[in-house]
């Protein structure tokens, strides 16, 4: 196991950005940066032993300061959408910044992904720390948060989120990596298969993607990934939910006890033989098929387009702060926020 640190550019404020490269005993490589606590690269040996970068991203830290698609981003304090960019907490209306169709998406334009984090290098892990002051993004409470990326010797990237606030607040963090198991520059993911540990999903009310509040069964619909299925098989089906969102961009409620750590998704690319198993203790996962990627210039000259990747964002249900049907993402003052999501890679 080795860890290397190198320059990765400069922020608009003149701060030095660093890139940390962790390599395990199998030759698998994980690259993360202290700008946004972002996952930059995951290089996995394919069935022929060729190192293959399976996450989309950019070559330079400067590029991540725009990062409209949220490549590899640590999202916080809240992932996904909050209707009307507002909610009530302890009888008080909390107003956030609307940044998508009048709603708040991924905590707004000043999300954690656009901030410098303090980095600490460990034997096989990089820990990133951030102090989020009371009122940052509109959320109450001083929130001290740590995100630790660990590369294990069984070829897993573990992401551990920890935090504590001095006031009741919202804590619903996630990682927005875009995966392509054929390689980040290999084109669309239509032929790659996906299986989700979910028999229900949360339908959205319209193209603004706020859930209706109901849990709908996936059975008999294109939303059924209870068995491995090619991502492209039904993505353009004549199905209202898919037409509203331009393809898969939906929250699936995981079939497991609340708080239990269990598998959420399994994906596979026959071309490379690379498989990925994802695990979490969160109640749900957003499956997004990169429907809105368009001519995005990425790593090593790659150009990323529509459906060239997929995201599996562990989370509380979208807009849960405004919908008591769902598990609530509120963190009590003085209590510890502690959640883990793991992406493990293997060859089949």
Regions found by a protein language model. Give the residues of each.
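An exposed, glycine/acidic-rich loop-and-rim segment of catalytic or binding clefts
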Residues: 1-348
């Amino acid at each position: 196991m080795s860890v290397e640190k190198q320059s990765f550019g400069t922020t608009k404020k003149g701060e030095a950005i660093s890139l940390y490269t962790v390599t395990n005993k199998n030759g698998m490589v994980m690259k993360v940066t202290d700008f946004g606590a972002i996952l930059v690269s995951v290089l996995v040996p394919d069935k022929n032993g060729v190192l293959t970068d399976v996450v989309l991203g950019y070559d330079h830290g400067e590029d991540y300061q725009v990062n409209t698609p949220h490549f590899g981003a640590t999202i916080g304090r809240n992932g996904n959408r909050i209707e009307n960019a507002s909610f009530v907490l302890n009888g008080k209306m909390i107003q956030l910044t609307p940044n998508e169709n009048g709603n708040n998406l991924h905590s707004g334009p000043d999300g954690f992904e656009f901030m410098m984090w303090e980095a600490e290098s460990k034997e096989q892990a990089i820990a990133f720390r951030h102090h989020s002051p009371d009122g940052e993004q509109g959320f109450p409470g001083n929130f001290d948060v740590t995100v630790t990326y660990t590369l294990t010797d069984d070829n897993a990237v573990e992401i551990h989120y920890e935090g504590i606030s001095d006031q009741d607040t919202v804590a619903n963090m996630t990682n927005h990596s875009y995966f392509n198991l054929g390689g980040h520059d290999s084109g669309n993911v239509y032929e790659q298969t996906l299986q989700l540990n979910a028999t229900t999903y949360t339908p959205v009310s319209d193209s603004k993607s706020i859930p209706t509040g109901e849990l709908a069964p996936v059975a008999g619909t294109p939303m059924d990934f209870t068995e491995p299925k090619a991502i492209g098989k039904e993505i353009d089906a004549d199905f209202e939910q898919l037409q509203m969102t331009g393809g898969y961009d939906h929250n699936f409620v995981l079939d497991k006890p609340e708080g239990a750590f269990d598998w959420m998704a399994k994906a596979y690319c026959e071309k490379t033989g690379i498989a990925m198993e994802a695990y979490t203790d969160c109640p749900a996962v957003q499956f997004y098929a990169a429907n809105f990627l368009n001519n995005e210039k990425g790593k090593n000259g790659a150009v990323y387009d529509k459906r060239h990747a997929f995201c599996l964002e562990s989370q509380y249900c979208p807009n849960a702060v405004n919908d008591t049907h769902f598990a609530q993402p509120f963190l009590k003052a003085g209590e510890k926020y502690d959640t883990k999501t793991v992406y493990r890679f293997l060859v089949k």
